[in-house]
Every structure is written in structure tokens, then in C-alpha cells.
Amino acid sequence: MPELVFFSGTMDCGKSTLALQIEHNRSARGLAGMIFTRDDRAGEGKLSSRLGLVTDAVEVGDGQDLYAHVVDHLSQGGRVDYVIADEAQFLAPDQIDQLARVVDDLDVDVYAFGITTDFRSKLFPGSQRLVELADRVEVLQVEALCWCGARATHNARTVGGVMVVEGAQVVVGDVAQSPDEIGYEVLCRRHHRRRMTSATARAAALSPDVLPVTAT
């Protein structure tokens, strides 16, 4: 039976790499897929991983009907044996419903990949709807690590290396930002709560300690 599967995790856990691997494995067996993405770091209409792999994809726009897009492709004689939706956290809840309809009405597997929570530890609406509708939710087993070495469970937004907790939910950035640019970093819960990024931890380590008073 076709399924709607949601592969979730923090940044740096290999979601897009797995999406590309699924695409490779199925296309190598002669299957035809359709790839959706939104706001990928490589630019519009691209699915990319941090390992440097990239392939073309359909850039999803606001209000776009994903079910209608698949049906239109089929009606023009195209094949769709599976659908991959990367950066699924950025999709609207209605678009997640449309992906579920692709599974139920067209008998096509849909593999969605996304981050569950934003930099404030709040669920993305698209991810929330996927958790509600998916036949399976798979938490990726490639663990991202906090700067302290603990398992990273939270996504932090940074400006110049300093964690921020206000702003729009969706701002495209990367983990390799230059000073004063918006970036993202994965943290363990403890350091997310303390708002301690790798940059602020380094700054604290380099700060001169108060010297002990010595007896004269």
C-alpha cells in the first residue's frame, strides 16, 4: 500500500541526503519521481544536501495545489511513481493535505522530509500537519551534535553567532554564515535554553577569569 512517510530531524541530520538517495535508488530501477522543494539553500528549484549533491526540483509557491500539479503531469502522459517533498516544514497545511490525497487517490508513495520545530522550539505548521496525517513518522538516526558533543535536538537561529529568539518563523540562512549574517546552529536542549551557541561558548572560554587573591 502506498504511504505518506515523514522523515524528520534537526538540521544537519541528513534529511536532504536521504531524499537524494531515495531518488537515486528509485530512478536507477526505472521509476519516475516528482520532487518538490521550497526555499532550498541552493536556490529556487533545487534539492541539495550539505555533501554537495544537488538535483532539479519543482519549487513550490504560495497557494500552489500539489495534487493538481501531479494530476496535470499525469494527464499530459507523464509518469509519477513516487513523490519527494523536501523542506516540507515550509509547506502550508493545505499542501500537506494535498500530498496525502496523492497517496490516497493516486496510489503514489510520498516521502516528505523536514525539520519538526523552528528556532523557538515551536512546531512548523507543515510539520505539525505531517505528524497528524503521515502513515509513518521516521526520526532520522544520523545524530546531529551540539557544540558540546551532546545530541542536538533543537534548531537555533543566530545573528553574528549570537542566538536570537524573535523574528519571522521562516528566514533562509545556513550553518556557514559570515559575521553579522543570519545563520542556524543545532544545539542540545540545555544550551538552547541557555542560548549558548558555539560562538558564545568560545567567547566565554576566552574571557579572562578573575584571578584568585593571593596571600601576601
Swiss-Prot record:
The keyword Transferase applies. Pfam families: TK (PF00265). Its EC number is 2.7.1.21. SUPFAM superfamilies: Glucocorticoid receptor-like (DNA-binding domain), P-loop containing nucleoside triphosphate hydrolases. ATP binds at G9, T10, M11, D12, C13, G14, K15, S16, D86, E87, A88, Q89. The active site is at E87 (proton acceptor). One of its GO terms (biological process) is thymidine metabolic process. It catalyses: thymidine + ATP = dTMP + ADP + H(+). It is found in: Cytoplasm. PANTHER family: THYMIDINE KINASE (PTHR11441), THYMIDINE KINASE, CYTOSOLIC (PTHR11441:SF0). Homotetramer. This is Thymidine kinase. It comes from Streptomyces coelicolor (strain ATCC BAA-471 / A3(2) / M145).
